[in-house]
Swiss-Prot record:
The gene is LECRK32. It comes from Arabidopsis thaliana. It is a single-pass type I membrane protein. Residues 1-23 form the signal peptide. This is Putative inactive L-type lectin-domain containing receptor kinase III.2. SUPFAM superfamilies: Concanavalin A-like lectins/glucanases, Protein kinase-like (PK-like). The protein kinase domain is predicted to be catalytically inactive.
């Protein structure tokens, strides 16, 4: 008996341990540069080929923002108490002509809706109406390079802690503590040099610490700002974390080179050698010229001619370079599908190296590739068995390349060599839906995201079936062929080009007999897929009890027993569920998987059901 108790205790410890590890994996990240980071960018923000994030350039009255692609859970799921969090990042502010402005902020916000926010002193987060409003629920740490007296700024080079507005509750001039000399040393924020920041919140002690240092210095023992602060009334269950910067009539380029974040534990440290380099600073302004005098006339004309000639030569060189790049990357265009050279595709994927492999399916393998420093692609490699198959596939590619819709993955072009075809797609950053549904390594999808994904897939299929010149059949509607972008919108991929290999559990009955895919077989597969999305399980799970092996039969039993709502994924928090939408989707799914293809709704009707513009037939869900 004692041994039994010991075994149980050990098992519990291991479960708790792996639960913590899993949670930590979901809420911890480290970015050396941002080329492959999962960021939601807006305004003037962009990622440069070197990997650094530019929030604003030196144009006036800009707002640039970049947030982590997923909201972060800040409450302990067991106690609902706020958790501790550390973050560290490296930034640089390069002033434009004249004085620098206005600054950047690290931000924790429940929403990414900053509509109406002003640039300049308001840092793209607030405006004159909502500044200081407790309903904002925003925490920011600002790095301000302009003194706004009306906002109680202490100087034009300070760090401040902001709650719900840009009037800081705590601020001080930018400096760092030198451990060797045991004194504070001034630090110019807009020096153009990289500065490292540590922001740490201890939930137990309700203490927020902010520490600064030059990039080449270790973390100081003493923080710059230390504020007793209970954030439980500010930070809600899930929040977005990221950066916001703004310019006004005075400007700066605001850069972020690296970012580390963690819930609980310790934020991962940077390897400084892996951080991207900053662009060269702008040359200083020349002093105003003296009034022209006659002896300078010939010299000025000569200089003007030299400048014009140099500009023309430079322009010709740039155009030549672009032309060479264009013709090297593309051989020709055939009916809308761009044809890439095999050398270009092979180089982009590292010779189809296994480290670039994204996944494999019945119809081909997918590889990640990089055409240019900021152009990431996905390449599908297909082997054709006959010349006729290859010819038919190329003809279909031309048609597919013309199909554009917000919920479909874009096909950029293709490459043909020997008996192989390579399809070049846009790369969708969050990859496939099945990773989120059937794995515990990623955050659990909220119901609001699942419902949006379902409607997105329906919209994509409706476009393929009825909104193109010639209807296109997908033939393989399943979770691994649905990709998610940075905002978790659905992007249906791998449509057309002979991908007629439906997965077990998704196959319509008539497809088994005829082998012919139709709009109705797509509808059947869609019905199974949306039940997977709601229930968080696969269509066929042989290890379950006999009555639960088939998802469709299990859901149908839920209808008959009056327990349909209990079929929903248990991992979704009940308070985030919309019961009416869950029931709507499951009942729509059952309509889509009816045995007779004539009894299944068209995708147009399915969209009307999901959008609430058409009522479901009354209790008519028997498959």
């Amino acid at each position: 008996m004692a041994n039994t108790y010991k075994s149980i205790a050990v098992s519990i410890i291991f479960l708790l341990y792996f639960s913590c590890v899993s949670s930590q994996q979901q809420t911890k990240f480290l970015n050396h540069g941002f080329l492959e980071a999962n960021l939601l960018k807006s305004g003037s923000s962009k990622i440069h080929p070197s990997g650094h994030l530019e929030l604003t350039n030196t144009s006036m009255r800009q707002i640039g923002q970049a947030f982590h692609g997923f909201p972060i859970p800040f409450l302990n799921p067991n106690s609902s108490n706020l958790v501790s969090f550390p973050t560290s990042f490296v930034f640089a502010i390069t002033p434009g002509p004249g004085a620098p402005g206005h600054g950047l902020a690290f931000v924790i916000s429940p929403s990414l809706d900053f509509s109406g926010a002003l640039p300049s002193n308001y840092l793209g987060l607030f405006n004159t109406s909502n500044n200081g409003n407790s309903l904002n629920c925003i925490l920011a740490v600002e790095f301000d390079t302009v003194q706004a007296v009306e906002l109680n700024d202490i100087d034009d080079n300070h760090v401040g802690i902001d709650l719900n507005g840009v009037i800081s509750i705590e601020s001080t001039s930018a400096e760092y503590f030198d451990d060797r000399e045991a004194k504070n040393i001034s630090l110019r924020l807009a020096s153009g040099k990289p500065i490292r920041v540590w922001i740490e919140y201890n939930a137990t002690e309700t203490m927020l610490n902010v520490t600064l240092a030059p990039l080449d210095r270790p973390k100081p023992k003493l923080p710059l700002l230390s504020r007793k602060l209970n954030l439980s009334g500010i930070i809600s269950e899930e929040n977005y974390v990221g950066f916001s910067a703004a310019t006004g009539t005075v400007t700066s380029s605001h850069f972020v080179l690296g970012w580390s974040f963690s819930i609980e534990g310790k934020a991962s440290d940077f390897d400084i050698t892996k951080l991207p380099s900053l662009p060269d600073p702008l040359p200083p302004l020349s002093p105003s010229p003296s009034p022209p005098v006659s002896v300078m006339k010939n010299s000025s004309n000569t200089m003007l001619i030299i400048i014009i000639a140099a500009s023309a030569i430079f322009g010709i060189l740039i155009l030549s370079f672009l032309a060479v790049c264009f013709f090297r990357r593309t051989e020709n265009f055939t009916g809308g599908a761009r044809k890439f050279s095999h050398q270009t595709i092979s180089s982009a994927t590292g010779g189809f190296d296994n480290s670039k492999l994204l996944g494999e399916g019945n119809s081909g393998s997918f590889y990640k590739g990089q055409l240019a420093p900021t152009e990431i692609i996905a390449v599908k490699r297909i082997t054709c068995n006959t010349r006729q198959e290859k010819t038919a596939l190329i003809a279909e590619i031309d048609a597919i390349s013309k199909v554009k819709q917000r919920n479909l993955v874009d096909l950029h072009g293709y490459c043909s060599k020997g008996n192989e075809i390579y399809l070049v797609y846009e790369y969708v950053i969050n990859r496939s839906l099945d990773r989120f549904l059937f794995s515990n390594d990623l955050p659990v999808l909220k119901w609001v995201h699942r419902f949006c994904i379902i409607k997105g897939i329906a919209s994509a299929l409706q476009h393929l079936h009825a909104e193109v010149q010639k209807p296109l059949i997908h033939g393989n509607v399943k979770a691994s062929n649905v990709l998610l972008d940075g905002e978790l919108n659905a992007r249906l991929g791998d449509y057309g080009h002979g991908s007629r290999h439906s997965t077990t559990g998704h196959v319509a009955p008539e497809l088994v007999n005829t082998g012919k895919a139709t709009c109705a077989t797509d509808v059947f597969e869609f019905g199974v897929l949306i039940m997977e999305i709601v229930c968080g399980r696969r269509a066929i799970e042989p290890t379950k009890e006999p009555v639960e092996i088939s998802l469709v039969n299990w859901v149908l039993r839920g209808v008959k027993s009056g327990n349909l709502l209990r079929r929903c994924d248990k991992r979704i928090k009940k308070k985030n569920l919309v019961s009416e939408e869950v029931l709507l989707v499951l009942k729509t799914g059952l309509l889509c998987v009816r045995r007779s293809p004539e009894d299944r709704p068209m995708m147009k009707k399915v969209l009307e059901y999901l959008n609430g513009t058409e009522h479901l037939p009354h209790d008519d869900y028997v498959v």
